[in-house]
UniProtKB/Swiss-Prot annotation:
Needed cofactors: Mg(2+)
UniProt cross-references to InterPro entries, sorted A to Z: PLC-like_Pdiesterase_TIM-brl (IPR017946)
Function: Dermonecrotic toxins cleave the phosphodiester linkage between the phosphate and headgroup of certain phospholipids (sphingolipid and lysolipid substrates), forming an alcohol (often choline) and a cyclic phosphate. This toxin acts on sphingomyelin (SM). It may also act on ceramide phosphoethanolamine (CPE), lysophosphatidylcholine (LPC) and lysophosphatidylethanolamine (LPE), but not on lysophosphatidylserine (LPS), and lysophosphatidylglycerol (LPG). It acts by transphosphatidylation, releasing exclusively cyclic phosphate products as second products.
Residues at the active site: H5, H41 (nucleophile)
Disulfide bonds: C45-C51, C47-C190
GO molecular function: lyase activity; metal ion binding; phosphoric diester hydrolase activity; toxin activity
Location of the protein in the cell: Secreted
Name this protein carries in UniProt: Dermonecrotic toxin SdSicTox-betaIIB1bi
UniProt EC number: 4.6.1.-
One GO term of the biological process aspect: lipid catabolic process
Catalysed reactions listed for this entry: an N-(acyl)-sphingosylphosphocholine = an N-(acyl)-sphingosyl-1,3-cyclic phosphate + choline; an N-(acyl)-sphingosylphosphoethanolamine = an N-(acyl)-sphingosyl-1,3-cyclic phosphate + ethanolamine; a 1-acyl-sn-glycero-3-phosphocholine = a 1-acyl-sn-glycero-2,3-cyclic phosphate + choline; a 1-acyl-sn-glycero-3-phosphoethanolamine = a 1-acyl-sn-glycero-2,3-cyclic phosphate + ethanolamine
Family: Belongs to the arthropod phospholipase D family. Class II subfamily.
Amino acid sequence: WIMGHMVNAIEQVDEFLNLGANAIELDIDFDKDGIAQITHHGIPCDCGRECTKKAIFTEYLDNIRQVTTPDNPKFREQLVLLALDLKLQRISSAKAYRAGEDVAKKLLDHYWQRGNSRARAYILLNIPLVEDCEFIRAFKDTLKNEGYESYNDKVGINFTGNEDLDKIRDVLEILGIHKQVWQADGITSCFARGTERLKEALEKRDTPGYNYINKVYAWTLVRKSIMRRSLRLGVDGVMSNNPDRVIKVLKEKEFADKFRLATYNDNPWEKFRG
């Protein structure tokens, strides 16, 4: 999975897909009451990027629904995963439950259209910290209460704050989540980061019977040398400001026979058995 980073303006969707991304990350900004308002990262952000691009969240969902719906004029077959980077750290943790309800309802109304949409992308909920876990509970409660629990099959969980992996496992256990879990490891492209935690996540992913990590990705990679390092370790995905660079690295002799781009036929919730 090549995840285009910080794709917050509607016009950026095609831009990043044209560069080779098959997944996109969008930042969800909330008001003080936990209502999802806009797709927006804000300052500071990655080096060399414009931090202020934005869109109304519901309008973004209306557009991306078309982009991921077969036979729609806007359909782009390659886009199979949407990572919602939830800016919960900007609101009180007491509002995390309200935020989860709101995002679930907006997805139901504007993306899935309560069963009337054929939009097919998988959804990854990127949670900043384990203290925000009530968002997950609320999201799942809302799907159940609204009568659409079946959409849980399309939704995965990912904690992005580089916290202790055993701490994350404990929270997932409390929430009763034993599948459809991704694990991110990374830092803004402005800084260097070692591989100790990334290696630990990959080791846990590959441990038989360990159900709390199905996929691992590294972020935000812009240098080809770091992309190569991550691929050698065996990551499932790379988040980048430059998907075209990832494409070029994947075509190199060292990687061409080991990796390929994920398609809709690849289940993002299953561990890869190479």
